[in-house]
Amino acid sequence: MKTVTVKNLIIGEGMPKIIVSLMGRDINSVKAEALAYREATFDILEWRVDHFMDIASTQSVLTAARVIRDAMPDIPLLFTFRSAKEGGEQTITTQHYLSLNRAAIDSGLVDMIDLELFTGDADVKATVDYAHAHNVYVVMSNHDFHQTPSAEEMVLRLRKMQALGADIPKIAVMPQSKHDVLTLLTATLEMQQHYADRPVITMSMAKEGVISRLAGEVFGSAATFGAVKQASAPGQIAVNDLRSVLMILHNA
């Protein structure tokens, strides 16, 4: 399987990489969080731009990105505006969403962008091509905060992300039962064994799905999200606890 290397971090081999989310609402809280996060041990920093209030100003967004980059120059930075329809904090037009991502790509400050699969195939493909032309990787994502689709449907979505050029396909779903968690793990394993030619990230959310955040190395998920202070999605656990369990499973 092809790995993805970002700032000397090899995603897709060994232990799942730990991603943490920074969710400051203004420039001061972004800076404070970024400085505080330097004390934590993790692999990738996701900036959840949908928590930032001044998204109407691209300049403000880029200023905040610069603050984060200056605070942590060596950590891979993932730029994520999560849409309201997929569990994010704000509603913006597709055009604004795409222009924010392009501005982030142009800035040279981010290593990866998160691009939602259901933004529209033509726009997704154009943005992937634009990112790759600027040496920025694409995590292509889909989130369902209400249910868990069938394993077949989840595999189809992940395969579509590959077909559209995602460097790392990602899916996160909400379980309504323990069986749903098994469905997500089944889809992950099937993808890894039969279709994936690049790293994939999957998770089942909430308390019920916590096992999926820990068992990535077993079933084929290349990264997992942990919390430094505040969780960005239900079911995330503290980064130190997360790393301990990942290491136990890795060394077993």
Curated annotation (Swiss-Prot):
Classification via PROSITE patterns: DEHYDROQUINASE_I
GO biological process: 3,4-dihydroxybenzoate biosynthetic process; amino acid biosynthetic process; aromatic amino acid family biosynthetic process; chorismate biosynthetic process
InterPro entries: 3-dehydroquinate_DH_AS, Aldolase_TIM, DHquinase_I, Type-I_3-dehydroquinase
Pfam families: DHquinase_I
Keyword Nuclease annotated: no
Enzymatic reactions: 3-dehydroquinate = 3-dehydroshikimate + H2O
Record flagged with keyword Amino-acid biosynthesis: yes
EC number of the protein: 4.2.1.10
Keywords: Amino-acid biosynthesis, Aromatic amino acid biosynthesis, Lyase, Schiff base
Pathway of action: Metabolic intermediate biosynthesis; chorismate biosynthesis; chorismate from D-erythrose 4-phosphate and phosphoenolpyruvate: step 3/7
Matching Gene3D superfamilies: Aldolase class I (3.20.20.70)
Residues holding 3-dehydroquinate: 21, 46-48, 82, 213, 232, 236
GO molecular function, one term: 3-dehydroquinate dehydratase activity
Active-site positions on this chain: 143, 170
Family recorded in the similarity comment: Belongs to the type-I 3-dehydroquinase family.
Quaternary context: Homodimer.
Role description: Involved in the third step of the chorismate pathway, which leads to the biosynthesis of aromatic amino acids. Catalyzes the cis-dehydration of 3-dehydroquinate (DHQ) and introduces the first double bond of the aromatic ring to yield 3-dehydroshikimate.
Matches recorded under NCBIfam families: aroD
Protein name: 3-dehydroquinate dehydratase
Encoding gene per record: aroD
